[in-house]
Amino acid sequence: MAASKIASAMGSRFRTWPIGETAALHGELAALGLKLPAAAIDGTGPDADASALSNALVSVGASGRGGTGSFISKSGLIVTNHHVALDAVRSASRRAGVDYLEDGFVAKRRADEVATESYECWITRRCEDVSAAVVEAAGAEADPLKRALAFRDAALKTAKDREAGEAGGARCEVKATWPERTYTLFVYERLSDVRLVYVPPRSLGNFGGDVDNFEWPRHTADFALLRAYGADGRPYAPSAHLRTAPDGADAGDFVFLLGFPGRTTRYAPASRLKYAETVAVPSLCRDFRRKLDLMERALDEDEGRAPPPAPAAAAPRIASYAAAEPRRAVPKMVDLGVTAKTRGKPTYPKKAPPAPAPPAAGGGCRLKIAAAKKSLANELKRSSGKRAMLRRVGLVAEREAEEQALVAAAPAARPLLDELAAVYARLEATAGRRDALEKLTGVYHGSALLAAASALYDAAIESAKPDDAREAYLRERNLDFTAARLAKRLDDVHAPLEAALVLDALTGSNWAALYPAPRAPNLDLAFNADRRDVRRDVVGLPTVPVDPVDEGAVEAALALPMHLNMVHGMTPGGCETLEAARSLVDKSKLRKLGKDELRAMLAAPKDMAWEVQSDVFMGVIESCYPPFLADRDETRALVGRRDRLCAELLDLQRGLDAGEPAYPDCNGSLRLSAGFVEGYSPCDAVVHAPRTTLGGLVDKADDAASRYEAGDARARDFAPPARFLDLVRGGARDTPANVLYSTDTLGGNSGSPVLDAAGRFVAINFDRQRPGLVNEYKYDPRYSRSIGVDVRMILWLVGTYDGAADLVAEMLEA
C-alpha cells in the first residue's frame, strides 16, 4: 500500500482529536496547510468566539443523535447525509402519503418545508473538565459492579446537576475522555423543530446500494438539506455557519473535518481484539444476516416482487432499467453563476403537529423498515469488513508484540494483561447467554414488541429505586427520549415481519444458556397471562381476581418443545409456526401504545393498564428477566473491571511515553481530523484516484443495466432517473461527484463537513472505503480513506437538476 501524503508529513500520529485540543495542535495543522487561527475553529472554551466553526456543527437525528450536520446559511439551513435524514424522510412519507424516499423532495418555498418527527439538532456550546467531581465520587469503590455503577451514577448526576442550572432547555452530558481518569462535561443547545428542505431521489441518494457501500470508486449523492427553526417558528439564526467553496478542493489540497465520531477502541489489549475477531463480530454478523433475510422475505411478500427477469425477457436497455422519474414537476434549469432574483419577504409558519399516517396499501412494509434495513445492511458489511481487515493487517499479532515490549519496560503490566485475558475469557464463556437475551429483548432491530415489553417491565422493577440509581434510560430526564424511541419502533411494526422476528427470538434463543436447569423457563405460564397474578406480585402492581391454574396441564406443557403452548388456545407445539407468532402480534395491546402513553407508563409503572400488564410479551420478558438481570450485572462488573485494568495499563504506557501527546478514544463528542485529498493503492497494480465524476456514474449505470438484463437483481441499485442521465450526457460528464481524502473518520462522522484550508465547505463526508473499516481499532494513513460528496455535485443536483435556485443562492451567500 502506497504511503500517503499525511503519513509523509507527520508519520502516523495525526488522528481524530477532541475539539478542545485544537489550540495545542495548531502548529502542526498550520504546517500541513491550515490558514485559520485555532480560535476560529474551536468555540467551546469559556472565552471562545461565538463565530468559531464548531458552532456551525450539529449532532442531528432522532433525539439529537444519528450523525453530523452543519449550518451552511445564516437562516438555519443544514447539510447532512441522505442516510442520516433517511428516517425523517421515511416518517414524513408515511404521514403525507407521498413517497419522498423514492421520489425525492424539494421545497421551493419555506412554507413547503416538511416537519420531521423526533429529529433534533444539538449544538456543542461548551465543554469543561469535571474529572475531579466524577473520580472523587467513584474512584474509591473496590467491588467491580459497585465501582462501575458508582462511575456511571457520578457522571449522570454531574450532568443532571449542571443541566438544572442551564437556561433554555440545554442538554448536558458527561463523557469519559480517559475512563476512570478524565471526564468532560458537554453543554448542548437543543433545537427540536427540524424540517426537510431537499432530498435527492433514492436512486441517487443511495446510488450503488449495498454493492457500492464501503467501496471506491463511488458516485453517490448521499446528502440532504434540512432547516432548523426556533421556538418562535422562524428559521434559526446560528452564531456561525460555513461558507461554501463552489470550486471544491483538488488533489493534494489540505482538508480537515469536524464531527461527532462514535466509539473507537484503539488502546484495546490483544485479548479484546481476539474476542472481537472470534466471538463478538461473528455473532453480530450472523444476527444481522438473519434479520436482513427476514426483512427481504417480508418485502417480497408485501410488494409481490417477481424474480429477476430472464435474459430472453429483457426489455430495451436503458428505458426499462432507468428508475421512473420522480413525480414532482420538471424544474427549470439554473445557471449556478447567476444570482437568484430577490425573493419577497418570506413567511415563517409555525411547526404543525404531525398528521396521522394514512393507511398504506402495498409498499407499506418498505417505508416502515427502510431505515432499519439500511442500518442492518450497513452494519453487516462494516462488521464483516472490519473483521477481514483485522486479519489482513495482523493487528492482534502487532498488539501482542507491543504488549511484550511494554512488559519488558514495565513488568507491572504483566498481571494487568493476564487479568484482562481472564475478563475476555469470561465474556466469551457467557456470550451465548447474551445473544439469547438480546434476541428476547428486541435489540439491534429485533422485535419491537419484545423491546417495548422489556423497557416497561424493567421500568416496573427500577421504579423501586431512587431516580439517581435507576438505569440511565429510565431516569426522569431521559424518559422523553426513551418513550419517543419505543413509540417510533411500535409505529413501524409491519405485522408479518414482526411475527417472523418474534418467532426467531422465541425458537432461536439458546435457553440452555439462560437456565442451567434441565428444563426451560416456565413460559407456558407467561403466555397464560390472562389467568394469573404472578406478575403483580413481582413488580408491585395491584392484583386482580384470577382463575386457578391447572397445574396438571402446566406439568404436561413443560414436556412440549419450547414450552410455548397454551398461548391463547394454541395447539401443542406452541409458538413454533409463523401463524402462531402472527396471532401473538395481532393480539398484543402494546402495538397501539403512543409516545405519551409510554411516557406515563415508564414514569409510573404501578398505574399501568391491566391489558398492558397482562400482555403476552410482558409475560415473555418476565420469564427471562432473572437471567437478564444477572447477565446485566455480571457484564457490567466485567466491563468495569476491564476499564480499571486498561486505565492502569495506560498509566504505565503513558509514563514511558512522557512528553508524547496522546489522543483519547472517540466517545461521540465533537472532534477534528485533518488530511489531504489523495488516493491510495489498495493492492498490487491498482491505484485509486481521489475523484469521480457524473460521467463515471452514467458509465456505471450503463454497465449495471446490462447486468440487470442478465438477471442480476442487485443492479437495480444503479438506476438513476432517465432525465438525470440525459442531463449528464448533455454536458455535465466532467462535474465532480465523490472525493477521497485521508482524514480519520468512523461511524458518527456521517454528515461531517469537509473543509478547505480557509474553513470553507468543499464536501460532505458519508463513508469509508473497505480498508478504512479497521479505523475503530487502528488508523493508518497508508490505507485509511474517507469518502465525501463533492460540493459541485450538491450544487449541480440542487440547482441544475432540481431547479432550486433560491437554495443554491442561499448556500453561496457569504
Regions found by a protein language model. Name each.
Residues M1-A814:
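Terminal presequence/propeptide segments associated with secretion/organelle targeting
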